[in-house]
């Protein structure tokens, strides 16, 4: 007999050789139906893995985040299974889980389109209904290569050849279909019930444009049909709110192949940009952050010292000049440290807070680029705080307070906080990481801020607090970060003199509140479906006359609005008033001022909102006061 300890502390005896699925069934048949995996002594395992020793066990169900990931990854394999049955000559490549779903890349010998997805999905449902048991076997590297070579799966062979010699290789099988995978998977295809294939896209093998273009099929998978239906409805809403479409319709920005992944900002877009940047500049000043500006390009030796060259080189753009190697910065922190290093600092000077709207460039794969949400060049609202270890918690609390304030002002009232812990690829020793992670936990605990832990998700130089914002249709966006760093100040020679006259290395706190301004503006556009709050919208008021007889009065009203700090647009075109109203309504201008003979004679304005609500007539002075009151209140 073996002893199994459960998360609630209870211990039960089972026969040796039992598996997690059987244990779940012994507790409740309904629990077994939704069990898709388990943590056995904190190791993620398949639900049918045999247990022969005393252990701690946590069952994973489809209600858990990990359970959904297992379900979705299994659905990706179900997709590959269906494709191989329908298109036997197709080669399969990779099929990872992504947010809310999965994708799988295929090398088809024939051309397929969106219309083929329904047939593939139908076959997936047929396979799932068979309820084929899913199992795996561990094989040697040589046997795995031989197995997939025999099947003509050259991409799988390529993957296996790059697997380190000491890494375990598993082949999962369901029915007649086998695939390479680390797992875990659901116990049976019958567990995969609520899924939908959503779109096709192209993707280069291994993200390299020199390689073959593959066909990527995206899908989503959920625990229940109700969850799936809710998500599909959200997708419909998201389609309507797509910032790329709205950005084009409102003349905010555009992209073109001459500069892939880098936005061309138009006047209307720059107006929003300025409001966001000016707001953050004022917030930084309020919270004691001075502003700096540092070089975009630095000698490659700086990036070697900072650790970026060894940990981040594949994402960096490099260049050469006069026989010197340079890199365009992927992050702002090393150049900020250089500003700190220009002076001697005493413990009395700390904390020293520096903010920078720094442009960074990252060599993101072309297939991952997505409008403003994933770009190769963006401006980060970075802040770097140099402080003594005993000041860390107080500084983190202050930054958390600033983040909460900023998000609420921009209309995000629902957000969660997470702590991303040490990744596998990192600098610094475990003792330093232990101390860093505990400091962030202490700061949040002291401020009564609830948080989740994200193992392995920290930056290579330190753990970080993440702020995840929920938008108007329920999507979660990872936005701001607060990162604790003991390593970089030391590597770059940052010091201060302590009260005993000794040199010490300061702790460096990296923080970004809105993060990438490009991405944050994209989030705002989708959150508000283009109907931005008055204080953010590019044009706040459109002034128009019923006929050209009102042109002079329209000009006067327009100038008065401008003098009162209102962003107004004057429309004197010789068009029908209905046409003008429709056009400015489509452009999401919040307020329309319509002037006719009566308004001109009384020197008043008639105002309507872009949604058609009539606010009636008022003096221009009252209208300006009304607008400025809303702007001040961030409405």
Curated annotation (Swiss-Prot):
Bound cofactor: record note? Binds 1 zinc ion per subunit.
Supply the Gene3D superfamilies for this chain.
Answer: 3.10.20.30, 3.30.54.20, Anticodon-binding domain (3.40.50.800), Bira Bifunctional Protein, Domain 2 (3.30.930.10), Threonyl-trna Synthetase, Chain A, domain 2 (3.30.980.10)
Q: Which domain of life is it from?
A: Bacteria
- Might you name a Gene Ontology BP term for this protein? threonyl-tRNA aminoacylation
What GO molecular-function term can you cite, just one?
metal ion binding
Q: Which cofactor does it need?
A: Zn(2+)
Binding positions for Zn(2+) per the UniProt entry: 333, 384, 510
Q: Name the GO cellular-component terms.
A: cytoplasm
Localisation per UniProt entry:
Cytoplasm
Give all residue intervals belonging to the TGS domain: 1-61
Keywords of the record, alphabetical order, are:
Aminoacyl-tRNA synthetase, ATP-binding, Cytoplasm, Ligase, Metal-binding, Nucleotide-binding, Protein biosynthesis, RNA-binding, tRNA-binding, Zinc
As recorded in UniProt, its EC number(s) are 6.1.1.3
Q: Which family does it belong to?
A: Belongs to the class-II aminoacyl-tRNA synthetase family.
Identify the HAMAP family for this entry: Thr_tRNA_synth
Q: What does it do?
A: Catalyzes the attachment of threonine to tRNA(Thr) in a two-step reaction: L-threonine is first activated by ATP to form Thr-AMP and then transferred to the acceptor end of tRNA(Thr). Also edits incorrectly charged L-seryl-tRNA(Thr).
- Note the subunit structure: Homodimer.
Output this protein's name.
Threonine--tRNA ligase
């Amino acid at each position: 007999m073996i002893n199994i300890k459960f998360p609630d502390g209870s211990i039960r005896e089972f026969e040796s050789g039992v598996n997690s699925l059987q244990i779940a069934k012994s507790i409740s048949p309904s629990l077994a139906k939704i069990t898709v995996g388990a943590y056995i002594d904190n190791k993620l395992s398949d639900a049918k893995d045999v247990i022969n020793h005393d252990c701690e066990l946590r069952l994973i169900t489809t209600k858990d985040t990990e359970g959904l990931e297992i379900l979705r990854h299994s659905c990706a394999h179900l997709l590959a299974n269906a494709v191989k049955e329908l298109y036997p000559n197709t080669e399969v490549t990779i099929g990872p889980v992504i947010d809310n779903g999965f994708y799988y890349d295929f090398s088809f010998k024939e051309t397929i389109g969106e219309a083929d997805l329904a047939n593939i999905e139908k076959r997936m449902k047929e396979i799932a209904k068979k309820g084929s048991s899913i199992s795996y076997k561990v094989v040697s590297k040589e046997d795995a290569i031989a197995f997939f070579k025999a099947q003509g799966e050259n991409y799988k062979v390529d993957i296996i050849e790059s697997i380190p010699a000491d890494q375990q290789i598993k082949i999962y099988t369901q029915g007649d279909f086998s695939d390479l995978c680390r797992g875990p998977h659901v116990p049976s295809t019958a567990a995969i019930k609520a899924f939908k294939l959503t779109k096709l896209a192209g993707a280069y093998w291994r993200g390299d444009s020199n390689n073959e273009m593959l066909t990527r099929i995206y899908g989503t998978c959920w625990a229940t049909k109700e969850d799936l239906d809710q998500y599909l409805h959200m997708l419909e809403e998201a389609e309507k709110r797509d910032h790329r479409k709205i950005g084009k319709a409102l003349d905010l920005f555009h992209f073109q192949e001459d500069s892939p992944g880098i936005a061309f900002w138009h006047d209307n877009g720059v107006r929003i940009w300025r409001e966001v940047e000016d707001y953050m500049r004022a917030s930084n000043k309020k919270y004691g952050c001075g502003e700096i500006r540092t070089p975009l390009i630095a000698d490659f030796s700086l990036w070697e010292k900072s650790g970026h060259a060894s940990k981040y080189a594949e994402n960096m753009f490099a260049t050469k000049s006069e026989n010197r190697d340079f890199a365009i910065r992927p992050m702002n922190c090393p150049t900020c440290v250089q500003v700190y290093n220009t002076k001697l600092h005493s413990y009395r000077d700390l904390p020293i807070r520096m903010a920078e709207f720094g442009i960074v460039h990252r060599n993101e794969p072309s297939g991952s680029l997505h409008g403003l949400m994933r770009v190769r060049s963006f401006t980060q609202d970075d802040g770097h705080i140099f402080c003594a270890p005993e000041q860390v918690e107080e500084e983190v609390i202050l930054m958390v307070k600033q983040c909460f304030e900023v998000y609420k002002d921009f209309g995000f009232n629902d957000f969660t906080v997470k702590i991303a812990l040490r990744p596998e690829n990192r600098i610094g020793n475990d003792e330093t990481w232990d101390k860093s992670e505990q400091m962030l936990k202490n700061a949040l605990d002291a401020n009564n801020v609830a948080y989740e832990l994200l193992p392995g998700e920290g930056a290579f130089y330190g753990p970080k607090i993440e702020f995840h914002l929920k938008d108007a249709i329920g999507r979660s966006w990872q936005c701001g970060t607060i990162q604790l760093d003991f390593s970089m100040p030391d590597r770059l020679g940052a010091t201060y003199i302590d009260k005993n006259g000794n040199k010490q290395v300061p702790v460096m706190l990296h923080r970004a509140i809105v993060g990438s301004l490009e991405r944050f503006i994209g989030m705002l556009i989708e959150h508000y479906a283009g109907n931005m709050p008055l204080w953010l919208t590019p044009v706040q008021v459109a002034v128009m006359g019923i006929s050209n007889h009102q042109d002079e009065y329209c000009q006067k009203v327009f100038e008065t609005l401008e003098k009162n700090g209102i962003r107004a647009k004057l429309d004197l075109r010789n068009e029908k008033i209905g046409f003008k109203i429709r056009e400015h309504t489509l452009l999401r201008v919040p307020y329309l001022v319509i002037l006719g003979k009566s308004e001109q004679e009384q020197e008043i304005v008639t105002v309507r909102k872009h949604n058609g609500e009539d606010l009636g007539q008022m003096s221009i002075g009252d209208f300006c006061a009304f607008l400025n009151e809303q702007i001040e209140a961030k409405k």
